[in-house]
Amino acid sequence: MEKLASLYHHHLATLQTRAQAVLARHKLDALLIHSGELLTVFLDDHDYPFKVNPQFKAWVPVTQVPNCWLWIDGVNPPKLWFYSPVDYWHSVAPVPESFWTAGVEIAVLRNADDIGQLLPAQRERVAYIGYAPQRAQDLGIRADNINPQGVLDYLHYHRAYKTDYELACMREAQKTAVIGHRAAHEAFLSGMSEFDINLAYLTATGHRDIDVPYGNIIALNEHAAVLHYTQLDHQVPSDVRSFLIDAGAEYNGYAADLTRTYSAQSDGAFAQLIKDLNQEMLALIDTMQAGVRYTDYHIQMHQRIAKLLKSHQLVRDISEEAMVEQGLTLPFLPHGLGHPLGLQVHDVAGFMQDDRGTHLAAPTQHPYLRCTRVLEPGMVMTIEPGIYFIESLLAPWREGECSQHFDWQKIDALKPFGGIRIEDNIVIHEGRVENMTRDLNLA
């Protein structure tokens, strides 16, 4: 914890510097960052699971407490009003005393509605950051200072550059996720259902379903062809062929996001395709470096997918270059190579080219790519290529002049396996790339 405290101290200094810059740019006195509020289920008496404002947990690792407030002026230590009511109906989080609290001024907020009396009276030039705009208006925040776009753009853009504290937290999240993946793989090998595999993952990670940073994808057989499959079937298929798990973990608000695909049989075309995709993915990561646009690596992955489709004779009698140019790889890999990762699984500002919000969209042919930025030291990205057998995407190719290039018999034989996705989390450094996932020996 001493090391984490030191890293957090420097992290806080970085955030303070960013705050000074954005406040000066927009002629503001302070940022008022809200952890969030509970939302009651319609016509009921209980609340939806609380999800904290990511801009709040960037400053303090308080992730499960609503009605908290941060006052940031970039000069004085951040002031945290920590919500700690007297309540015998619900558990109340204790007032924090941890590695990070020495750098933050903490005051206890017993009643959520009292915050208006406790904040500094002058709020004319204060920007509210949060998802309760009506609360901000009630506090006297000007409408144009409620989530002002220029402030958000600046904060989001710079979140791409992770501090050493953030990287330390993300490495810890990796460790937890890897433990979960190994437990889930064992559950798969023992013949469990999707539902029970998910329980094994959650038990191993110490997470609840509402704690994981993104809904776990636990897919057997054809279910792996649904990119965001979260159904969790209770029944084990009569013939188990494949298992895809896309699941992460969280540490101090920072996410891990890992995917692995397994074949029930160690030999056969599908098992070999997994091995070969894994090799191509690692080979691509070996080429990655700062100074190159992420889009370029996405295109290069499609070239590698073309190579695999040809070597496995799923597509034939056409060059790899022509396959990519004519879009024949797209039905097999319909999503992007990956995305920024951090406080959110799909972290912000993937398209921002500067801290004023200049937007560079994904290429027209690849609309689902989530990042077009030039890679720079401190960025954390997922690398998650796939090869899927999705009938709705393949169907248009069954007709027309390109149909002759597809070996439909081999493709249809692989459809019952659903598809493959393999995902690692990498850090861009000056002169090297750190693969946090493989460093923990998750094959």
Curated annotation (Swiss-Prot):
This is Xaa-Pro dipeptidase. Mn(2+) 1 binds at D257, H339, E384, E423. GO terms for biological process: proteolysis. The keyword S-adenosyl-L-methionine does not apply. Splits dipeptides with a prolyl residue in the C-terminal position. GO terms for cellular component: cytosol. Its cofactor is Mn(2+). The keyword Metal-binding applies. It catalyses: Xaa-L-Pro dipeptide + H2O = an L-alpha-amino acid + L-proline. Keywords: Dipeptidase, Hydrolase, Manganese, Metal-binding, Metalloprotease, Protease. It comes from Pectobacterium atrosepticum (strain SCRI 1043 / ATCC BAA-672). Mn(2+) 2 binds at D246, D257, E423. Its EC number is 3.4.13.9. The gene is pepQ.
